[in-house]
C-alpha cells in the first residue's frame, strides 16, 4: 500500500541503468529454491479467521482509544504519546488491506466488510482503492515494469526524489478528503469526471502512469457503494468541523494521525524493495532478490512492517501465504536452504541500513 506520487522514469537514465538492467536480466530462476518453497509450505496456506479478527479488532480498539485520548488530553506530552500509539495501532489495522487483496474472502467470512467498516471508511481508504491494483504488482510479467502500479526505479533516480516520495505522504489525509468529499459527488453527477476519477484517483499506487479500468458487474456495484458511504462520511466530517460539532483541534489531530500512518507506510514502502529495475521483465527469482525480508532478531519491524510485511520478499515468492504463516515459512526455508543460499540474500538487518543503501544509490546519479 502506497500513496500516489508522480516521478518521471527518465530521471533514472544513466550509465548505472544499463548495468542494473543487464544484472537483472541475467538472473535466472532458481528452480530448486522455488520447488522447495512450494513443497515446504503447502500446509500453511489456509488463513485462520480467529487470528485475523482478533488482530484487526484489537488494533482498532487500541488505535481509536489512543486517538480519542490524543484529542482530549490537556497535557501536550501525553497527547503526543497517545497520538504515537494511535498512529502505530491504526497503521497495523490499515495494513490488513494488503491481506484483503490475497485471501479468498470466503476463507475469512465478513472480513472485507468488517475491515471497511472499522478502518477503511473511517480513514477514507476503502478496500477498492487497493483491490484490483495490488494483484497487478504480483503479475509475473508486470513486476518492475512501467505497467506495475506499485513500482518505480527509485534507486536509479535523483537524490531529491526520495524526500519528495516521503514528503508527499504527509498530505495523504487532505488528498483523501478531496477525493471523497469533492470528487466523488462530482463523479456521481458528471460521467466525464467519473471517468477521470476512476482512472487517476482510485488507486493506492506510486506509478503516475498507471490508469485504472472500472470494474464491471457486482464489483462495480460494490465499488460505488463503498465510495458513496466514504463520501458521506468525508462530507459529514467536514460539516461537523464547520459547525463546531467536532472541535478544530480534534480534527487537526485526526489529520495528523492520518499523516503519521501514511508516512510510516511510505517509509516501509521505500524499503520493501531495492527498486533497482528499470522496466525489464524479471524472473520470479529476480523479483525475490529485488524485494526485502527483515526477519528476527530485528525487533522494530514489528512496528513499521506489521501484518507480515517484514517478510516482503518471501511474500513475493509465496503470495498466497496468509500473514500469520510467514514466520514459520521463513524458519522452514532458512533451515532447508542453509545460510549460504540464494534465499538468504533477500534478508536484511533493519530499516536504517536499507534507507542508507537507497540514499547512497541515488547519490550516484
Identify the function of each model-found stretch.
Residues 113-119, 279-293:
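Membrane-cytosol interface motif
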Residues 95-114, 142-154:
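Aspartate-rich (DDxxD/NDxxD/DxxxD) Mg2+/diphosphate-binding motifs
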Residues 1-86, 121-251, 323-365:
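Non-catalytic, topology-defining segments of multipass membrane proteins
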Residues 205-214, 287-303:
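Cytosolic juxtamembrane regulatory segments of multi-pass membrane proteins
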Residues 94-103, 130-142, 269-277, 306-321:
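Histidine-centered catalytic micro-motifs
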Residues 87-97, 126-130, 253-282:
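Transmembrane alpha-helical segments that form the membrane-embedded catalytic/substrate-channel core
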Residues 56, 60, 83-84, 88, ...:
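Residue-level signature of the transmembrane alpha-helical core
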